[in-house]
């Protein structure tokens, strides 16, 4: 998993509340267990017309936001079913940070397992960031995970809170497998001691 230390990029505004995982990645795209290629299905029902052509009114289809790395979204983002394809689709599109006032718990935790930083802010700060994100190609935000700070295009900054363990994992690019490997030496030492003291179990 790639480390997340500092991210600077275009932020796309999506001022819609209760965006569920079916909206993030419709069920038609859930037939694969591969993490790649799902970006094309991200927000598919909103991004594409019935004939498969792009909907020019959807934010991620607008030229300024096609390469967005940050998503500023309405309250209760990621609600609904627990499909892990939702963060996979965001990541495959290129989005590594989602900012909202709240997230569904399962989606929130799945983000950290896949190298995405979900940030919770107050409604007041979300309104400001949504305004910043509405500047098109000038909607550049910098998310500094080391200092827990978001800097806007005008230089103003917003602090955010994050569980220290989750912060550690993102800063070091550790998913569940990475965490286990990080403890590899301690696991080996335990196995040796356990085998010596309980030879019948070896």
Curated annotation (Swiss-Prot):
Pathway(s) annotated for this protein in UniProt: Amino-acid biosynthesis; L-leucine biosynthesis; L-leucine from 3-methyl-2-oxobutanoate: step 2/4
Keywords: Amino-acid biosynthesis, Branched-chain amino acid biosynthesis, Leucine biosynthesis, Lyase
EC primary class: lyase
Tree of life domain: Bacteria
InterPro entries: 3-IsopropMal_deHydase_ssu, Aconitase/3IPM_dehydase_swvl, AconitaseA/IPMdHydase_ssu_swvl, IPMI_Swivel, LeuD
GO MF annotation: an example: 3-isopropylmalate dehydratase activity
One CC-aspect GO term: 3-isopropylmalate dehydratase complex
Coiled-coil segments: none
GO biological process, one term: L-leucine biosynthetic process
Record's catalysed reaction(s): (2R,3S)-3-isopropylmalate = (2S)-2-isopropylmalate
EC id: 4.2.1.33
Subunit structure: Heterodimer of LeuC and LeuD.
Protein family per UniProt: Belongs to the LeuD family. LeuD type 1 subfamily.
Role: Catalyzes the isomerization between 2-isopropylmalate and 3-isopropylmalate, via the formation of 2-isopropylmaleate.
Xref: HAMAP family: LeuD_type1
PANTHER family: 3-ISOPROPYLMALATE DEHYDRATASE SMALL SUBUNIT, 3-ISOPROPYLMALATE DEHYDRATASE SMALL SUBUNIT 2-RELATED-RELATED
Protein's name according to its UniProt entry: 3-isopropylmalate dehydratase small subunit
Lineage: Bacteria, Pseudomonadati, Pseudomonadota, Alphaproteobacteria, Hyphomicrobiales
Recorded name of the encoding gene: leuD
């Amino acid at each position: 998993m790639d480390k997340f230390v500092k991210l600077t990029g275009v932020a796309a505004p999506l001022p819609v509340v209760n965006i569920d995982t079916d909206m993030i990645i419709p069920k038609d795209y859930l037939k694969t267990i591969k993490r790649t290629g799902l970006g094309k299905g991200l927000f598919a029902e909103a991004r594409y017309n019935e004939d498969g052509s792009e909907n020019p009114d959807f934010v991620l289809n607008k030229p300024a936001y096609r390469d967005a790395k940050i998503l500023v979204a309405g309250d209760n983002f990621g609600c609904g079913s627990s499909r892990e394809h939702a963060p996979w689709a965001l990541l495959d599109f290129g989005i590594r940070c989602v900012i909202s006032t709240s997230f569904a718990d399962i989606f929130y935790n799945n983000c950290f397992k896949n190298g995405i930083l979900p940030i919770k802010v107050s409604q007041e700060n979300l309104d400001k960031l949504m305004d910043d994100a509405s500047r098109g190609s000038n909607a550049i935000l910098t998310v500094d995970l080391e200092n827990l700070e978001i800097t806007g295009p005008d230089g103003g900054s917003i602090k955010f809170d994050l569980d220290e363990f989750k912060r550690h994992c993102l800063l070091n690019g550790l998913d569940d497998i990475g965490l286990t490997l990080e403890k590899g030496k301690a696991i080996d030492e335990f196995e040796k001691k356990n085998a010596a003291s309980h030879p019948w179990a070896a």
